[in-house]
Amino acid sequence: MSFFNRLFQKERPKEIPTMPPWEEIVEMMYDKCLDAFTAEVVRVVYSIDNTMRYVVLRYEQGLYTYQLEAIYKLDEDEWRYALSHNDDALPAMWESIGCAVGKSLFDSEEELLKEMKEEPEYKKYFE
């Protein structure tokens, strides 16, 4: 009879840990998800509070571009769903800000950095 009990016994739902505080999430996300890019990551520049970053990429052709990203914190439902499918899920993710289509390409990293430092977001959050 114990065989049938084990066979039809419902699994207890696993306990979902509480969402970590924002400061811990920011620390946890530092240098995460950089392997998702198809181009080579050359440099990562973080904002003063580490909640945003510019990712500088180099393509095989030798051209450079960059992408601005910010931390997106999952809400409670998203957090529960993520943990129900993956025990190693993070409570946040890096999300691209702005349109990835039509990004400028640069011949050198120096030229790219000069242009990047002129952006309003850079002046507001990175200096």
Task: List each model region and its residues.
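Compositionally biased, intrinsically disordered low-complexity segments
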Residues: 44-48, 59, 100
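Low-complexity intrinsically disordered segments
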Residues: 112-127
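Negatively charged, low-complexity tracts enriched in Asp/Glu with abundant Ser/Thr
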Residues: 3-52
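A structural signal for the main folded, soluble domain(s) of proteins
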Residues: 7, 71-72, 77-79, 103, ...
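A short, structured beta-strand/loop element
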Residues: 56-89
